[in-house]
């Protein structure tokens, strides 16, 4: 069964209004410069792992500019860098201690266990496939299908990465245009500002089929407005950060 989303003039006006208002914000500009760039930087183990850590930490945590998580992500050297974690005898304990020191992560015991498991899985057998799927998107602009293949791989392979987080990671790497993380900011905008035809809830979005249904609507909406979901996502994020 197919659902045919009908985009109205008012729908397009709502999207264009937020895009125009937020077009000069740093995050919208960053999406144009990185996610929409025709050539992208080759993804390394170090970059993939760092973003895996940071994106896992965003679950149920405020991640706007100036917060603890934002400051943690900007630290140089990064406290949980790939080479640093490699050297640890007890990676789970080291990750948990580091998260506690910097006061990031809503459930540090669970997050530490999942990240340690993911690190072991990458080291054991997953690095070739993970980097292949990422770097395929750096060679040429990906289709929505190739982006979705990467998101589904992350969702199926790594602990703590559901439909949203599995799209957060590649978007943070600058790889994706279509497959966006539909987080609480996006659902709030869809429900309150855009007036989506039915209420979109975070709980329902944990189901990958429901998630793809909502993302189908967002992709069609953006196509009709001559923009990309990653840009709309950035505009929504920027607008709600200002309102907070």
Label the predicted regions:
Residues 1-46, 110-119, 127-244:
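C-terminal accessory module of base-excision DNA glycosylases/AP lyases that mediates lesion recognition
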Residues 1-105:
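Structure-specific DNA junction-binding interface
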Residues 59-60, 101-102, 122, 172-176:
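Alpha-helix C-capping/helix-to-loop hinge sites
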Residues 96-124:
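Long, charge-rich low-complexity segments
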Residues 59, 71-78, 118-131:
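Basic/aromatic-enriched alpha-helical hairpins
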